């Protein structure tokens, strides 16, 4: 074993792992296949490309993902520094300009004196170095075969990408600005109200639409947080109205009442020239997307700069294969990080990369790997991912249901605040030791 670390994959997890290891004085080689090869879902040449939504979800500590963000900020996360520096208006959420975000991370990685960035596809895992595999949900076929030889079969499912429209193509006479319950600046989202007749027609069109078929060998298992819009419609006619099209907290200023349903558009860039359709990940064919999404009031003449699409997501059976340190049980010099471990979400991926990077650096220095305290958001997530039911393991977002209970009686409305307070105190004590 050498004193070097090899990291495969320049996504959020890989870049966070690189940063943490290099900042601890260890030389790191990062392998990223772009721009020599692109997956079907990637378009930017830079590192840390966001391929699904441009939102890192809620900021409030009332949400576990908000707590995880704060933990990572306190721990010196590169991904959180990039997100804070490139944010765009998004109400109570943290959304970013994805091109600026990628550029920020790329510049930091390229200019770190202890990082060697190697552009090109990798088809094998080094046999001597400490290695972090952070190849993400779109692992190349060659490397996937090598990983499969080490870990056994992977399970495939699809994530889904939402369409983006230009702001200038929208009919603003039919759209109103507002954030749900007035959060954020109060007008961060564009809202397209639908009456009952419009909603029913929209659902009918989605249900009858032509979809891109999955290939026979690919098992389709959708994670709830990125469910295709047509899949939701198939669950029931009201599902969309209680999901991404829910109107609660969004009174139409022209009527003073909540519409029957609302399609929300969120800024895709700082300039506000592009908006994505929130929750509209889809595997509808491109012609059907143009036809059906232009049924939405205000989008009749929408110009689509990107249409929705589906891409494969590959993840290992983490509880069977990984220790809580993210080391492979069968070969402790190999660590995994990111969505390939079964964490779901940008922030969760960054968190797993943080821990993998810290532990890889500790291995180089001859120190014992560490696990975050269970009471922290990162610790609760890591513990779940590596200790879940092996037979029924599925990807998981961070959530307060993963946390150990508080001691004593706590009022329900105070519970999350107390969990967050405890977590940050534990995090502050722990981070000084790693």
Swiss-Prot record:
PROSITE patterns: GIDA_2. Keywords: Cytoplasm, FAD, Flavoprotein, Methyltransferase, NAD, NADP, Transferase, tRNA processing. It is found in: Cytoplasm. It comes from Geobacter metallireducens (strain ATCC 53774 / DSM 7210 / GS-15). The gene is trmFO. InterPro entries: FAD/NAD-bd_sf, MnmG-rel, MnmG-rel_CS, MnmG_N, TrmFO. Gene3D superfamilies: FAD/NAD(P)-binding domain. Its EC number is 2.1.1.74. Catalyzes the folate-dependent formation of 5-methyl-uridine at position 54 (M-5-U54) in all tRNAs. One of its GO terms (biological process) is tRNA wobble uridine modification. Its cofactor is FAD. FAD binds at residues 9-14. One of its GO terms (molecular function) is tRNA (uracil(54)-C5)-methyltransferase activity, 5,10-methylenetetrahydrofolate-dependent. It catalyses: uridine(54) in tRNA + (6R)-5,10-methylene-5,6,7,8-tetrahydrofolate + NADH + H(+) = 5-methyluridine(54) in tRNA + (6S)-5,6,7,8-tetrahydrofolate + NAD(+); uridine(54) in tRNA + (6R)-5,10-methylene-5,6,7,8-tetrahydrofolate + NADPH + H(+) = 5-methyluridine(54) in tRNA + (6S)-5,6,7,8-tetrahydrofolate + NADP(+). It is an enzyme of class 2 (transferase). Belongs to the MnmG family. TrmFO subfamily. GO terms for cellular component: cytosol. It comes from the Bacteria. SUPFAM superfamilies: FAD/NAD(P)-binding domain. This is Methylenetetrahydrofolate--tRNA-(uracil-5-)-methyltransferase TrmFO.
């Amino acid at each position: 074993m050498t004193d070097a670390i090899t990291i495969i994959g320049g996504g959020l997890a890989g870049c966070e792992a690189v940063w943490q290891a290099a900042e601890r004085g260890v030389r790191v080689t990062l392998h990223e296949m772009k721009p020599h090869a692109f997956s079907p879902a990637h378009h930017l040449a830079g590192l840390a490309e966001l391929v699904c939504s441009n939102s890192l979800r809620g900021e409030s500590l009332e949400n576990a993902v908000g707590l995880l963000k704060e933990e990572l900020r306190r721990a010196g996360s590169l991904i959180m520094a990039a997100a804070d520096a490139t944010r765009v208006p998004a109400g109570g959420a943290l959304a970013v300009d994805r091109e600026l975000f990628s550029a920020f991370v790329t510049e930091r990685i390229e200019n770190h004196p202890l990082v060697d960035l190697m552009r090109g596809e990798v088809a094998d895992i080094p046999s001597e170095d400490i290695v972090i595999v952070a190849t993400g949900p779109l692992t190349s076929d060659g490397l996937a075969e090598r990983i499969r030889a080490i870990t056994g079969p992977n399970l495939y499912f699809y994530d889904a990408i939402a369409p983006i429209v230009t702001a200038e193509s929208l009919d603003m006479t039919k759209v109103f600005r507002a954030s749900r319950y007035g959060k954020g600046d109060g007008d961060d989202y564009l809202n397209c109200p639908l009456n009952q007749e419009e909603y029913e027609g929209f659902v009918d069109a989605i249900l009858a639409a032509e979809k891109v078929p999955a290939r026979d060998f690919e098992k389709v298992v959708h994670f709830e947080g990125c469910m295709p819009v047509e899949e939701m419609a198939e669950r029931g006619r009201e599902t969309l109205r209680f999901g991404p099209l829910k109107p609660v907290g969004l009174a139409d200023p022209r009527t003073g009442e909540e519409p029957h349903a609302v399609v929300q558009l969120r800024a895709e860039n700082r300039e506000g020239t592009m908006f994505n359709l929130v929750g509209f990940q889809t595997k509808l064919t491109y012609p059907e997307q143009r036809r059906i999404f232009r049924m939405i009031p205000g989008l009749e003449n929408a110009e689509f700069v990107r249409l929705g699409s589906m891409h494969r997501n590959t993840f290992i059976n983490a509880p069977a294969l990984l220790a809580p340190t993210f080391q492979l049980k069968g070969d402790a010099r190999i660590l995994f990080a990111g969505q390939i471990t079964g964490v779901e979400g940008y922030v969760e991926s960054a968190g797993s990369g943080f821990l993998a990077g810290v532990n890889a650096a500790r291995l180089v220095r001859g120190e014992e790997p560490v696990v975050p305290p269970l009471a922290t958001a990162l610790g609760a997530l890591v513990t779940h991912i590596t200790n879940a039911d092996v037979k029924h393991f599925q990807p998981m977002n961070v959530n307060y249901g993963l946390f150990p209970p508080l001691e004593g009686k706590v009022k329900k409305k105070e519970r999350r605040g107390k969990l967050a307070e405890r977590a940050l105190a534990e995090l502050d004590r722990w981070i000084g030791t790693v």
